[in-house]
Amino acid sequence: MTDTPKPPRKKPQRPAKPAAPREKATLHPRNRHQGHYDFPKLIKSSPELAAFVILNPYGKESIDFANPQAVRVFNRALLKAFYGIAHWDIPADYLCPPIPGRADYLHFLADVLAEDHEGVIPRGASVKALDIGTGANCIYPLLGHSDYGWQFVGSDIDSTAVAAATAIVKANGLHKAISVRLQGNRKQILLGLCDSNERFDVSLCNPPFHASLDEAQRGSQRKWRALGKADPKRKLPVLNFGGQSQELWCEGGEIGFVTQLIQESARLPGLVVWFSTLVSKASNLPPIQSALKKAGALEVKVVEMGQGQKQSRFVAWTFLDKAQRTPG
């Protein structure tokens, strides 16, 4: 009788890697910018856009996103058609933001607030939001007020940006809903910005994510080359979609800025119910989460977002317990 041969020994299995998403990440369900843009509709609302519409390599109408003027006019058309913002312009060389991604941040933040309101998104003028680094474009207050009726205070360390944002607010008759103020101390973010009796339901921030001007320029050149790769001889601007130095970089980069924001929020724990900030790289999350733990945040949320091939996220934190956050 022969012994049955033993099966070969199996090698230990390595943990499976997470499966890559099969489809492009999609916008938030409430985002107004689903699917392809309706350029005939946009041009009807904003005729100046017609001069900038091109056919992309797939034969679809688009604009040249490597042309700052085209992006500016496109944004103006989107704001008018989707949000009722009739007047919007920013000084040359200031950041011209992609509107769908900015809107996504607001919609996901609204969901965070809804969790403390029995699943109902709080709307109207009773909701106060603080936009840290609102910029000349004032984009978050404009979108947030249009979509949810929230009241906004925007802040910035750049007096030119404050003046431009204020002009946009006044031109659209929104001065009762949106105000913009200067943070006079460039080394502070929250400290010295608000009165002792001011309270906000939520704060938001798109932090500068480079640690130096050189790093910002290298990052922008990579983006420009991706956008302009069809024409390698094309002369590329230095900074992608505009942007003043304080909009793009600061000492310590994104981690340094967000860590300071967390430290200052811990000194003003009752100023905002839910503080939040965008985080450009997932690799920056561990030191940020460590800073939040050290600061004594009671609850921290990391919310992932996706627009097409781009993944982004924000971190939200609070120093208030559920009872303190729940109205009534």
UniProtKB/Swiss-Prot annotation:
BP term (GO), one: rRNA base methylation
Pfam hit, one: Methyltransf_10
Compartments it resides in: Cytoplasm
Top-level taxon: Bacteria
Gene Ontology terms, MF aspect: 23S rRNA (adenine(1618)-N(6))-methyltransferase activity
InterPro entries assigned: METTL16/RlmF, rRNA_lsu_MeTfrase_F, SAM-dependent_MTases_sf
Region (Disordered): 1-38
First-level EC class: transferase
Reactions catalysed, as given in the entry: adenosine(1618) in 23S rRNA + S-adenosyl-L-methionine = N(6)-methyladenosine(1618) in 23S rRNA + S-adenosyl-L-homocysteine + H(+)
Main location: cytoplasm
Annotated EC: 2.1.1.181
Gene3D superfamilies from the UniProt entry: Vaccinia Virus protein VP39
Xref: CDD domains: AdoMet_MTases
Keywords: Cytoplasm, Methyltransferase, rRNA processing, S-adenosyl-L-methionine, Transferase
An example Gene Ontology CC term for this record: cytoplasm
Assigned protein family: Belongs to the methyltransferase superfamily. METTL16/RlmF family.
HAMAP family: 23SrRNA_methyltr_F
Main function: Specifically methylates the adenine in position 1618 of 23S rRNA.
Name of this chain's protein: Ribosomal RNA large subunit methyltransferase F
Organism: Pseudomonas syringae pv. tomato (strain ATCC BAA-871 / DC3000)
